[in-house]
Amino acid sequence: MGAASGRRGPGLLLPLLLLLPPQPALALDPGLQPGNFSADEAGAQLFAQSYNSSAEQVLFQSVAASWAHDTNITAENARRQEEAALLSQEFAEAWGQKAKELYEPVWQNFTDPQLRRIIGAVRTLGSANLPLAKRQQYNALLSNMSRIYSTAKVCLPNKTATCWSLDPDLTNILASSRSYAMLLFAWEGWHNAAGIPLKPLYEDFTALSNEAYKQDGFTDTGAYWRSWYNSPTFEDDLEHLYQQLEPLYLNLHAFVRRALHRRYGDRYINLRGPIPAHLLGDMWAQSWENIYDMVVPFPDKPNLDVTSTMLQQGWNATHMFRVAEEFFTSLELSPMPPEFWEGSMLEKPADGREVVCHASAWDFYNRKDFRIKQCTRVTMDQLSTVHHEMGHIQYYLQYKDLPVSLRGGANPGFHEAIGDVLALSVSTPAHLHKIGLLDNVTNDTESDINYLLKMALEKIAFLPFGYLVDQWRWGVFSGRTPNSRYNFDWWYLRTKYQGICPPVTRNETHFDAGAKFHVPNVTPYIRYFVSFVLQFQFHEALCKEAGYEGPLHQCDIYQSTKAGAKLRKVLQAGSSRPWQEVLKDMVGLDALDAQPLLKYFQPVTQWLQEQNQQNGEVLGWPEYQWHPPLPDNYPEGIDLVTDEAEASKFVEEYDRTSQVVWNEYAEANWNYNTNITTETSKILLQKNMQIANHTLKYGTQARRFDVNQLQNTTIKRIIKKVQDLERAALPAQELEEYNKILLDMETTYSVATVCHTNGSCLQLEPDLTNVMATSRKYEDLLWAWEGWRDKAGRAILQFYPKYVELINQAARLNGYVDAGDSWRSMYETPSLEQDLERLFQELQPLYLNLHAYVRRALHRHYGAQHINLEGPIPAHLLGNMWAQTWSNIYDLVVPFPSAPSMDTTEAMLKQGWTPRRMFKEADDFFTSLGLLPVPPEFWNKSMLEKPTDGREVVCHASAWDFYNGKDFRIKQCTTVNLEDLVVAHHEMGHIQYFMQYKDLPVALREGANPGFHEAIGDVLALSVSTPKHLHSLNLLSSEGGSDEHDINFLMKMALDKIAFIPFSYLVDQWRWRVFDGSITKENYNQEWWSLRLKYQGLCPPVPRTQGDFDPGAKFHIPSSVPYIRYFVSFIIQFQFHEALCQAAGHTGPLHKCDIYQSKEAGQRLATAMKLGFSRPWPEAMQLITGQPNMSASAMLSYFKPLLDWLRTENELHGEKLGWPQYNWTPNSARSEGPLPDSGRVSFLGLDLDAQQARVGQWLLLFLGIALLVATLGLSQRLFSIRHRSLHRHSHGPQFDSEVELRHS
């Protein structure tokens, strides 16, 4: 909004001067000095005539100097401008003092009203009242404030070469960016760069300005500014107008706030609070039309922002002004004179000159030279600005023959309103159609609402800002707002009236009012509020004069010469008459009136009220103290992309290319895993690099996006996932090294064998696994256990420290603290570690009772030499290489041996079951639930048995997705037994998950969290393993049903499920601590066994040393597969089972439920699986279980009968729960003290030197005391659990064998 350069005042005659040394006083030309006049009205007439001819000369020089400076800010131009300013002040002082000297007693009694107005203006000296030194100081302050504002720049963080000026750079950012952080940076940068340096200058300016105007008889500068409106009730009248208009603003504010909430979300928009000031499309949130695209009521209607059409048609700045001129001439108003086109600056110069870009219209006071200075951009809102500025020029042209003192608007608001009146016609769809910017005009209700809302974003949004700026300045001038409260009061008013808040913390070092042009340039602002009311009064009157009938907002006065004639009369009057008279002649009323404005916006007012009521909007901002948080990674992340269309295009391309790359990688990986050779290893490494390059390429591109600003949740989720480059973040050399280490570790593990002295060698699968499962000979088990760790674990130790270094480096490059932090992030749960600990504590009593019972059974079999009833259990005696599941020693611990056997292996072998038959049965279970059958490719391409052709393969069971929507496979060295039947269902669960989400984008083809993927197959296995289901498969002779049969069944399940809980918990407890550095490589093995003792109550059967690496003997460690997923899976599978049993209509104990053939259960499961990773896992949990949290209650319910029985048995035998003799080992039973010829001691199963052992003893003493306290607490807990369990009904089981998931 340009200030009209026609009124004598500091903001008009004294704009920009550089801060230079004070200029010497210049003598006024004698011909410009006042002569001698009589002190009566006749003399005053001659005085006024003489003043007018002299003033034209002085004002021309002053304006010309200011123009030269504003269009080329240099020191020389500043010096010349200051000279001109001082001369104009000297001229004002000479003539003003003469006017006071001659006419002070009598001028108000003159009969000629125009003469009174002229003398009144001349006698007001303003800054010319000041003595020379202060006058020079005053001029310097004005010039420096203007210079600071006009040359302020905002530079990118750490990039001083990339800096933005306000216009057009920052203005464009505020208008077009939808990035919260970018908008914030531009907003904060401008307010700091322009505002902060101005504060001390503004304090000094205020003091000098008040001093000057007090000498003219005003109480302060604000009183002088208000005097132009010649109304004693002016302030009250404005307040009354504002109150009339406020309801419309409140409804607009609430509607826009809701739209911004849709875009920026809860974090940045409070639906009961103020709106952050940088989000409304404008640096000062004074007009909101630039966010019209975000708030448009009916987006399917024709677009009323014709900017794109203007650009397509090749509009330029000159054409925009020609179009505006043609509107004025169509009303038979004056065309622009030649000087206008020759002298104006209509675009920002391309030659590098510093200019004042703020749009303004200039009167050079010679009655022929009128210019506009505007850095015009080809946009629709700038087209309105063009008409606004040309309105000033038209005013100048119409009153140019009046005396200089009367060349002004009837009041300042009149001058601002004229161009805007025409812009109200220009912006109508009908007029835009006439000038070729709209293809057609639709006047239906929806199009009307679109148009009126667009106008409201410009006109209604501005009202509180137009009102408050001078409320603040009047407070400053009067002293009500001292300099210690400049910023506080500014934001108090902006929140009170506009309902906006600063987006970052502001304090009194800031001077945010100074970041608005009119404050440092000393241009009064209330004129704009007045003009926004007046222009609608004018519009209504001119439409009536033009003969228009219909809705006011559709009126276009284009080509109405009658309207032009009526307007001309107003313009030609200048300020020669009281504005009230001029207004009455124009509209028939002598006061400002909000009714035409309210009438214009009535349709959209009603629509907004209805919308806000429907949405339950709160009008106003009751939570007025709310402020938004700073964005993450601010300000470094400000240049991130937030455009939804660009993000969508990126996601489509990523998905298309990923399907190809991931398919090729999966094929190469499959070929390696099913045929380990140098050639397949080489190809896999190549594909590894290919997929790393793909990940790096698209991950790097994804990091250009600010996911926090994207609104499409699917696109947001995909891009956030793709931004994590994982290992591909590593530099090429380190990535190659990392891939080779992983391959070396995995190959070492997969080809390791343990050999007898006779030369025969055993592999892990199936040989050593069978030994651990079936042998009951202590030494044979020890040989297999120790041999596997010597071959697999020790060999992997050499690679592991470098692996840790590189995986941590990759995690840090992806923004994580370490690799553990990265792995935990997959659960999107900040409290994950605390939640897991809570779940473990809930289940620990069940594990301790099972541990004590099994230890007693092992004591019966192996004797006191090998089993201590108060100590940990040797790790090799539990039927499994890692003692993670104990079901293989069921025969040693079976509660009721005489009850019918539940081992179906013999029946399966007798009936000729094959691995393929086992998977067919699993497929049949899924299809019985209405779920998908596996496709033909599955049967043709899977490896369901260990090859007999001598190939080396990775036997560890795994499920594979080949990313083409039809190829899904399982790799498993299946043995015909019940355990592998359960594993087959587990693996088929992965395949079913793959099939259910196959149509999602590649990045979302995962489980809701990693535990979900592991749980699905196990949920079905919980049904498959029931005696009822095994009987239906003809694998058991009866369904059982007796209490003894139930306890046997639950014991078998507990040996799988409960025994696994502490192991699945501790593996990643160990790795997370390795990754965070709290476990060093020197202590890898010692800390591994500390955790296995603490959580599992196990000890190594032979001493271990630092040279051993027993974690490496577990597949998931060398293969870098996170393990906590299995702990999560074992918890949630029972929650799923309980919920699906309810859906299936099951009644009775949860452990007897079989959901086979329940379509209802299948539907519930399918709905959750189809989500893949597209939603946070609690939503998938809600779909299955009806609530969003992980809970151990279903698992406890499932095993409650067993817990009751175990507790009774353990009490009967006086079992000690836990392992109070925690430092016992089988080796220590044979020999305590130094090992032969070594100088070392066996301690906690570890081979340590004496000093290490002494430190360990002190640590264990502390642990012992802690364990005693824990045991006492546990007793109380068991009592309370037993007490509570009497009042609970049963929940459900789950069944799982952990496997590697190869799908990602």
Curated annotation (Swiss-Prot):
Phosphorylated by CK2 on Ser-1297; which allows membrane retention. Phosphorylated on tyrosine residues on its extracellular part, promoting cleavage by secretase enzymes and formation of the soluble form (Angiotensin-converting enzyme, soluble form). The dipeptidyl carboxypeptidase activity is strongly activated by chloride. The dipeptidyl carboxypeptidase activity is specifically inhibited by lisinopril, captopril and enalaprilat. Zn(2+) 1 binds at residues 388, 392, 416. CDD domains: M2_ACE (cd06461). Its main location: membrane. Disulfide bonds join 155-163, 357-375, 543-555, 755-761, 955-973, 1141-1153. The active site is at residues 389, 518, 987, 1116. This is Angiotensin-converting enzyme. The lineage of its organism: Eukaryota, Metazoa, Chordata, Craniata, Vertebrata.
